[in-house]
Structures are given as C-alpha cells and as structure tokens.
C-alpha cells in the first residue's frame, strides 16, 4: 500500500 512504499523509499534513501 502507499504507506509501505513510502517506508521502503525512506529505507533506501
């Protein structure tokens, strides 16, 4: 879901 994608992006960056 949206929240999950944002969390992954924050972990990558």
UniProtKB/Swiss-Prot annotation:
<comment type="similarity">
    <text>Belongs to the grammistin family. Group 2 subfamily.</text>
</comment>
<dbReference type="GO" id="GO:0031640">
    <property type="term" value="P:killing of cells of another organism"/>
</dbReference>
<keyword id="KW-0354">Hemolysis</keyword>
<keyword id="KW-0964">Secreted</keyword>
<keyword id="KW-0204">Cytolysis</keyword>
<protein>
    <recommendedName>
        <fullName>Grammistin Pp 2a</fullName>
    </recommendedName>
</protein>
<keyword id="KW-0044">Antibiotic</keyword>
<comment type="function">
    <text>Has lytic, hemolytic and antibacterial activities.</text>
</comment>
<dbReference type="GO" id="GO:0005576">
    <property type="term" value="C:extracellular region"/>
</dbReference>
<keyword id="KW-0929">Antimicrobial</keyword>
<dbReference type="GO" id="GO:0042742">
    <property type="term" value="P:defense response to bacterium"/>
</dbReference>
């Amino acid at each position: 879901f949206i929240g999950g994608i944002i969390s992954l992006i924050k972990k990558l960056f």
